[in-house]
Curated annotation (Swiss-Prot):
Residues 59-176 form the THD domain. Glycans are attached at residue 91. This is Tumor necrosis factor ligand superfamily member 4. The chain crosses the membrane at residues 29-50. It comes from Mus musculus (Mouse). Residues 51-198 are extracellular. Homotrimer. It is found in: Membrane. The keyword Glycoprotein applies. One of its GO terms (biological process) is negative regulation of extrinsic apoptotic signaling pathway. Coiled coil: none annotated. Cytokine that binds to TNFRSF4. Co-stimulates T-cell proliferation and cytokine production.
Length: 198
């Protein structure tokens, strides 16, 4: 009675579990090979990314300039020379080379009553800047969407005084890019815009 129809334990292991064990071992080898190949591909990708030079974002565009006098109906803007200035002034206009949102800040005091308009695009109406102290003081901030080839400049109208005789105290213009966008390659602005000789 002992052992009728029941195989001994040693025979059961030899007959049934060995093929299953070989299948698991083969499956583990295949999975390990795939993992190893995946790790190798990831390593190669990381090495290629580190070896290639990263795309350099253009610096944030900014300008701080003094508004000192009036010339030909426009306020004269002279930029301070330092390493933080990334924009330039041409013909009393701040040249925009990169698309994006910009904050424009203007302050100053005048000895006469004046009206100032902010211009930045040829086909748009200028922004009439509100004045304080009977048109003699200005503290103005605006956020504008500017694009490549735009020019920021200020026109002034003084009812009782010629432009060249306006007296300006503590005038300052600050233009700072808030959101980076498309930037024209260096030198492209000079070749695409007609310059007016002084």
């Amino acid at each position: 009675m002992e052992g009728e129809g029941v195989q001994p334990l040693d025979e059961n292991l030899e007959n049934g579990s060995r093929p299953r064990f070989k299948w698991k071992k083969t499956l583990r080898l295949v999975v390990s090979g795939i993992k190893g190949a995946g790790m190798l591909l990831c390593f190669i990708y990381v090495c290629l990314q580190l070896s290639s030079s990263p795309a350099k974002d253009p610096p944030i565009q900014r300008l701080r300039g003094a508004v000192t006098r009036c010339e030909d109906g426009q306020l004269f803007i002279s930029s301070y020379k330092n390493e933080y200035q990334t924009m330039e002034v041409q013909n009393n206009s701040v040249v925009i080379k990169c698309d994006g949102l910009y904050i424009i800040y203007l302050k100053g005091s005048f000895f006469q009553e004046v009206k100032i308009d902010l211009h930045f695009r040829e086909d748009h109406n200028p922004i009439s800047i509100p004045m304080l102290n009977d048109g003699r003081r200005i503290v103005f901030t605006v956020v504008a969407s500017l694009a490549f080839k735009d020019k920021v400049y200020l026109t002034v109208n003084a009812p009782d005084t010629l432009c060249e005789h306006l007296q300006i105290n503590d005038g300052e213009l600050i233009v700072v890019q808030l959101t980076p966008g498309y930037c024209a390659p260096e030198g492209s602005y000079h070749s695409t815009v007609n310059q007016v000789p002084l």
